[in-house]
């Protein structure tokens, strides 16, 4: 089996290799060794004795000393009882003297035993005629019990007679083999055993002829007695068959030749097996006798389930050993009979003692027997489902067609010539597009009749190159070519980073395909499913880019369903859209789509208050939205489809069309299985089932992505990541924010570890000791998390929460009393249409609460009964963090993450009480802090008790001073309410401007305060979508300078909103799901941003929040590995979840300075310097996820990941330590070089003073470099100023969209600092940029005069 592109048709679509299977086995062996070593160390630490070795291993060793061949050919494992008896037997058979004594003793009693056995037989047969079946079973049970007692008290010896009984059993087994040999069911694997059966039979005959007369008689008597025992243990339905068998066998009295008895046995068994299946015989054991007999002894190998059975040594013994053998057969008989069919296929010949024969038989048996799945072994392609194989083959064929098309045609054409931007950057990323042709219509022969799929010129001029490639990707996925319009098409994921213009790409793509003559016939109706809070934004974007851009583009009917409030209105709107003859687009929210199409669960009782009008209209809704539904569907923020078991995903997959386009900026959220759900929506079966995907990718990547992974696991992970990335590269188009760095100012992210105050530490420890207990892990993780979050936010939050809970409890009791007094009926028929409005998507399904842990009406009653849920109360599932969630699945992110990672759950997490809040505060939590006296009423307005609030206030004041707008994201509405109250309190008491700072943008004598709607704005779940758009527009208004702060709930405002007016973001608390925080920061870092962006993440140091952030780091690393194929440093250990409850605060020592260098952000540096008691340290977030070049696979290694010819080399990346190299030409920071005095004089003539430079943005960035030089900074600022002077004289068509040079030089500064280059390198790059521009514009007439002036003032720059 080969991987990747293979010439063989059989290997199409294969992504797993044979060498990978071997590597997986090696990893599993390493993991087993590690587990054994850890267990041993744990026992040593606890003082426990080492575990005793199993006797089976000793038996194996002893048998190997006696006979190596017998050890290799040991019989299969029997029942546990047989093994226990075999243990005692094998311990006393070592010495030769005992064996001689046993032989002599057994010969004396041969005749006596023969008489006793015949007597027992007659007694048993007579009792069968007289007694009933029930009495017969009771006797057999008593006899077996008696036999067991006797064998347990006997010594561990075995007689010569029992060995002969084993030989008779072996002869029977040979007859079975002979019969199986002639059957039609035999396959190729049994051929070796067939060839050996004749030899085995001949050898058995020769051995039987050499037996003495006494041995033959003993064998005959043993055989008869054994059959009697079997007959007694048989069930009623098998008794007649056994009687018939025993009569036939007893009639055979001749014992002269054992071959004769063998033939008769064979004939009898064939007769018995013809009408009905043969009863399976008990498991046999290996025979070992005296030295001369052991050479001729036969070995019988029987099938096993798991491992080789223990080697059983049998020697001469007393008379009781015969009874023991009989009882063993009786015990095993019933179990073995259930598997008789299996034995007929896998049983083997046991007379050949050669090693080769046994080996062949074992191999053939392993092939015949279905293997149990082993942990850590990758699935072979033969184990995959047919759907998976077909999907992989179809995708491979599509990729071949696309590669051929790309070689023959490239429809994305850039304008000829070079503009200013391209000359400076050295790339074509900023060059304007000349034309974008998606399909040349090559199938049409007539040139005049060809209708290429081409983007309209009015749209081409506003597109960027990466957006043109995204449009081409969507066309290749949904349509592929005009020749394949009759096929069902397929889908793809446009996984462009937030801010790269995915909405514009979709609008351009839809306009292009809908207005095409051929495609428009097949695709007229498009459904765009988006989050509720961006419905209006999408509608406005269609108007902006189509209607407002060019009247010729206004050819598509665009409508949104949210504006229709009643069921009937929505039905009419969908009917008009579905039956439209012109191209039309319908925009709908995820929640409304689910409500209109969800099917009732037949297992659940229908609610009495359900909307009957909606139930009647659902049939039409499903027709319009699902089957036949739209011709194409577009899903924005498609990571909402992360759980294929959710109601939303179940509704979405029922859409009939396969032309599905998914948009997401964060394709990977909590785990790889969520990624699988999204890919499976657009490409069903491509990644296989969940089990197949987990086996082939998830398990391997998860093992190797942590720092405690072995080198082999890391190597295997890298290979799997590359295979997964390459496997999906034609259906997932990923572009990260590096595209933004070439077009907008840079971004800096900082993680600030905030120190806990003494009061917070005392409360945290008290809660750990008194409430959580000594177990270390509470059974109520989510309630504990919320309690901790209140502590690290502000201690008084505990009191406010309890007060709100008490108020709600009283209101709930009053409502229950009123409900008991007034009977309103079920309300099923009286429900008005007006109740089913757009608010039903979220407002009627949720109650707006202040935080996720607000219990509301879902508190548990004391009697244990489920509380009645009011109409306005949430339905069954409530939100985890706040009421801002846009669908019911988002609220379960945390709970699902904890469940998947093995954290202990309470009953409420396990879903036993699904109608109750997952985050209900347990009764023992109520008022626990009041007993300690750590929280007082006067703490309400003491905001110094929280260092997070102190840092927040300082950053807001600094932003006021420099004129920057700020966004504050929090996942808890409690925190947002606290921030509001703090700002209003400080403004009302005159504390805000008491420190003397001034707002830069305050006009004249205008006094700013903190009034909602004027000074700050809020977006949370209670703000309707229409109002959100108005708030966003007002905040982004460049003339509205007073609105300088926006408070946003993480989930309500992190999706799809545009806040480019702000350039600083504070993420107040870390979220379990990293995608929410990532979405938040990209509200400001997107196209349209004109200032450098600064992100500050507040993390409560030493707390559970710090551990949550570490989980985010691991998840983002996985996302970049799989989606971007970036090799990221493996972050933290794999067992971090077990450390969630550890509290390791850092105490403040005023004599010890903060252990970190000043950040490049001057604002943050000032804040940290002023508040060192509040900050432990900081880290740059982007540095954690910088692409580690050392871990990248080379081109050859990428091939090896597919062909598996050799293993990858692994190694931990080592970050280069900072060491400033000597800078020749710049000693002691002084400017040295040609015409230095002239440079200084010209600088003075232009009025450039040092005090003015201190406020220059470029100069500030130069001073933040880790390797900096003042002289070089002055030179670079001068070059920038000269280019700014000549820019107005450059024609607009040559600028390439460049309006200033500041951004270009700042990008050079950051690039140089990131690569740890010297200031000399930066100066060289700056001079190259300067000369490039001068060379480009020197022939332009308008530029001649300013260039002549520069030449006179700075001749050395033009030399």
Curated annotation (Swiss-Prot):
Which of UniProt's keywords are assigned here? ATP-binding, DNA damage, DNA repair, DNA-binding, Helicase, Hydrolase, Nucleotide-binding, Nucleus
Q: Which of this chain's residues are annotated to bind ATP?
A: 496-503
Is this entry keyworded DNA damage? yes
A GO CC term assigned to this protein in UniProt: nucleus
Q: What is this protein called?
A: Transcriptional regulator ATRX homolog
Residue positions of motif DEAH box? 636-639
Gene giving rise to this polypeptide? xnp-1
- Domain named Helicase C-terminal is located at 951-1134
Compositional bias ranges of the Basic and acidic residues kind: 11-49, 321-336, 383-397
PROSITE patterns to which the protein is assigned, alphabetical: HELICASE_ATP_BIND_1, HELICASE_CTER
Question: Which stretches does the entry tag as region Disordered?
Answer: 1-402, 809-891
């Amino acid at each position: 089996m080969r991987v990747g592109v293979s010439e063989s048709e059989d290997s199409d679509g294969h992504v797993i290799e044979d060498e990978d299977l071997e590597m997986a086995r090696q990893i599993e062996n390493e993991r087993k060794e590690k587990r054994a070593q850890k267990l041993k160390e744990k026992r040593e630490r606890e003082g426990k004795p080492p575990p005793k070795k199993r006797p089976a291993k000793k038996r194996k060793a002893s048998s190997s000393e006696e006979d190596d061949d017998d050890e290799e050919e040991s019989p299969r494992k029997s029942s546990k009882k047989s093994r226990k008896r075999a243990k005692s037997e094998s311990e006393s058979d070592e010495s030769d003297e005992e064996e001689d004594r046993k032989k002599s003793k057994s010969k004396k009693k041969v005749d006596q035993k023969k008489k006793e056995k015949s007597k027992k037989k007659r007694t048993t047969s007579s009792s069968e005629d007289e007694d009933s079946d029930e009495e017969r079973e009771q006797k057999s049970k008593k006899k077996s019990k008696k036999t067991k007692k006797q064998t347990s008290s006997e010594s561990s010896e075995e007689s010569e007679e029992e060995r002969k009984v084993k030989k008779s059993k072996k002869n029977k087994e040979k007859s079975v083999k002979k019969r199986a040999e002639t059957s039609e069911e035999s396959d190729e694997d049994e051929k070796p055993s067939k060839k050996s059966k004749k030899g085995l039979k001949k050898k058995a005959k020769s051995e039987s002829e050499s037996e003495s007369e006494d041995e033959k008689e003993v064998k005959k008597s043993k055989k008869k007695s054994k059959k009697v025992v079997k007959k007694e243990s048989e069930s009623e339905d098998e008794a007649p068959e056994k009687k018939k068998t025993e009569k036939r066998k007893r009639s055979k009295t001749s014992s002269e030749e054992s071959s004769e008895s063998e033939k008769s046995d064979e004939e009898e068994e064939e007769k018995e097996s013809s009408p009905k299946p043969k009863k399976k015989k008990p498991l046999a054991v290996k025979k070992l006798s005296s030295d001369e007999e052991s050479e001729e002894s036969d070995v019988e190998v029987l099938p096993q389930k798991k491992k080789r059975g223990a080697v059983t040594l049998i020697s001469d013994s007393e008379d009781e050993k015969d009874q023991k053998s009989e009882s063993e057969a009786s015990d095993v008989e019933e179990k073995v009979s259930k598997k008789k069919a299996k034995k007929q296929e896998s049983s083997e010949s046991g007379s050949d003692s050669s090693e080769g024969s046994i080996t062949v038989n074992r191999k053939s048996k392993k092939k015949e027997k279905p293997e149990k799945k082993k942990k850590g072994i990758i699935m072979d392609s033969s184990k995959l489902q047919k759907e998976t194989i077909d999907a992989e083959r179809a995708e491979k064929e599509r990729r071949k067609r696309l590669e051929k098309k790309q070689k023959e045609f490239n429809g994305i054409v850039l304008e000829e010539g070079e503009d200013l931007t391209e000359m400076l950057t050295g790339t074509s990323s900023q060059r304007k597009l000349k034309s974008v042709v998606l399909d040349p219509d090559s199938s049409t022969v007539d040139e005049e009749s060809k209708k290429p799929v081409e983007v309209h010129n009015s749209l081409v001029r506003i597109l960027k190159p990466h957006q043109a490639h995204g449009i081409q990707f969507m066309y290749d996925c949904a349509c592929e070519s005009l020749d394949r319009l009759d096929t069902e098409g397929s889908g793809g994921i446009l996984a462009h980073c937030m801010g790269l213009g995915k909405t514009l790409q979709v609008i351009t793509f839809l306009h292009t395909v809908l207005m095409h003559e051929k495609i428009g016939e097949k695709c007229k109706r498009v459904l765009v499913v988006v989050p509720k809070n961006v419905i209006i934004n999408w509608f406005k974007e269609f108007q902006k880019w189509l209607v407002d851009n060019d009247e010729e583009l206004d050819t598509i009917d665009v409508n949104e369903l949210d504006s229709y409030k009643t069921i009937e209105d929505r039905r009419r709107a969908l009917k008009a859209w579905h039956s439209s003859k012109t191209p039309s687009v319908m925009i709908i929210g995820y929640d409304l789509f689910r409500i209109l199409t969800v099917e009732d669960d037949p297992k659940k009782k229908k609610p009495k208050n359900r909307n009957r009008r909606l139930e009647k209209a659902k049939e039409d809704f499903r027709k319009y939205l699902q089957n036949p539904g739209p011709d194409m569907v577009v899903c924005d923020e498609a990571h909402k489809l992360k759980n294929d078991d959710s109601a939303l995903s179940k509704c979405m997959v029922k859409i009939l069309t396969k032309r599905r386009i998914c948009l997401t900026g964060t394709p990977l959220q909590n785990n790889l299985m969520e990624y699988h759900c999204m890919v499976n929506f657009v490409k069903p079966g491509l990644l296989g089932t969940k089990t197949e995907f987990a086996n082939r990718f998830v398990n391997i990547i998860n093992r190797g992505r942590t720092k405690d992974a072995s080198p082999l696991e890391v190597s295997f992970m890298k290979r799997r990541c590359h295979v997964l990335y390459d496997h999906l590269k034609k259906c997932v188009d990923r572009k990260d924010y590096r595209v933004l760095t070439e077009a907008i100012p840079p971004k800096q992210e900082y993680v600030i570890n905030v120190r806990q105050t003494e009061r917070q530490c005392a409360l945290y420890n008290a809660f750990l000791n008194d409430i959580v207990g000594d177990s270390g892990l509470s059974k109520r993780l989510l309630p504990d998390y919320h309690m901790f979050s209140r502590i690290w936010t502000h201690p008084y939050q505990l009191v406010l929460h309890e007060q709100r809970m008490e108020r709600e409890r009283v209101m709930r009791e009053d409502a229950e009393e009123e409900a008991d007094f007034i009977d309103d009926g079920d309300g099923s028929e009286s429900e008005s249409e007006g109740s089913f409005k757009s608010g039903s998507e979220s407002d009627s399904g949720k109650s707006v609460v202040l935080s996720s842990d607000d219990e509301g009406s879902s508190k548990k009653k004391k009697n244990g009964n489920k509380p009645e849920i009011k109409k306005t109360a949430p339905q069954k599932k409530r939100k985890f963090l706040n009421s801002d969630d846009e669908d019911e699945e988002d609220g379960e992110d945390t709970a699902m993450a904890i469940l998947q990672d093995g954290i202990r759950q309470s009953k409420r997490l396990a879903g036993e009480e699904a109608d109750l809040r997952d985050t209900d505060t347990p009764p023992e939590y109520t008022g626990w802090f009041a007993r300690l006296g750590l929280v007082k009423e006067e703490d309400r307005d003491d905001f110094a008790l929280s260092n997070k609030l102190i840092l927040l206030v300082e950053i807001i004041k600094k932003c006021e001073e420099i004129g920057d707008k700020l966004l504050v994201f929090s996942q808890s509405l409690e925190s947002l309410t606290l921030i509001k109250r703090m700002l209003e309190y400080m403004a009302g008491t005159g504390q805000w401007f008491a420190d003397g700072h001034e707002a830069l943008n305050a006009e004249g004598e205008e006094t700013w305060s903190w009034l909602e709607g004027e000074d700050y704005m809020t977006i949370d779940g209670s703000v309707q979508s229409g109002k959100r758009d108005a708030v966003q527009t007002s905040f982004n208004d460049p003339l509205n300078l007073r609105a300088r702060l926006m408070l946003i709930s993480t989930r309500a405002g992190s999706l799809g909103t545009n806040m480019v007016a702000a350039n600083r973001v504070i993420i107040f608390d870390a979220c379990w799901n990293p995608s929410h925080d990532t979405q938040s920061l990209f509200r400001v870092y997107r196209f349209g941003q004109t200032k450098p962006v600064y992100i500050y993440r507040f993390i409560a140091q030493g707390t559970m929040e710090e551990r949550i952030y570490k989980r985010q780091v691991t998840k983002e690393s996985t996302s970049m590995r799989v989606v971007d194929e970036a090799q990221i440093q493996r972050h933290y250990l794999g067992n971090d979840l077990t450390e969630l409850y550890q509290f390791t605060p850092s105490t403040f020592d005023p004599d010890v300075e903060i252990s970190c260098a000043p950040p490049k952000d001057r604002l943050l540096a000032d804040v940290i310097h002023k508040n060192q008691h509040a900050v432990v340290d900081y880290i740059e977030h982007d540095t954690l996820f910088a692409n580690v070049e050392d871990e990248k696979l080379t081109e050859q290694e990428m091939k090896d990941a597919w062909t598996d010819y050799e293993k990858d080399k692994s190694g931990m990346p080592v970050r280069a330590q900072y060491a400033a190299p000597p800078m020749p030409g710049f000693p002691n920071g002084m400017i040295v070089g040609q015409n230095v005095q002239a440079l200084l004089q010209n600088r003075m003539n232009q009025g450039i003073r040092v005090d003015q430079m201190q406020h220059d943005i470029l100069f500030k960035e130069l001073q933040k470099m880790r390797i900096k030089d003042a002289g070089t900074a002055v030179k670079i600022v001068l070059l920038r100023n000269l280019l700014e002077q000549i820019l107005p004289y450059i024609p607009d068509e040559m600028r390439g969209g460049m309006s200033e040079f500041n951004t270009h030089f700042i990008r050079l500064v950051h690039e140089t600092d990131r690569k740890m280059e010297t200031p000399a390198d930066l100066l060289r790059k700056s001079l190259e940029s300067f000369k490039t521009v001068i060379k480009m514009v020197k022939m332009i007439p308008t530029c001649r005069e300013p260039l002549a002036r520069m030449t006179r003032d700075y001749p050395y720059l033009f030399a």
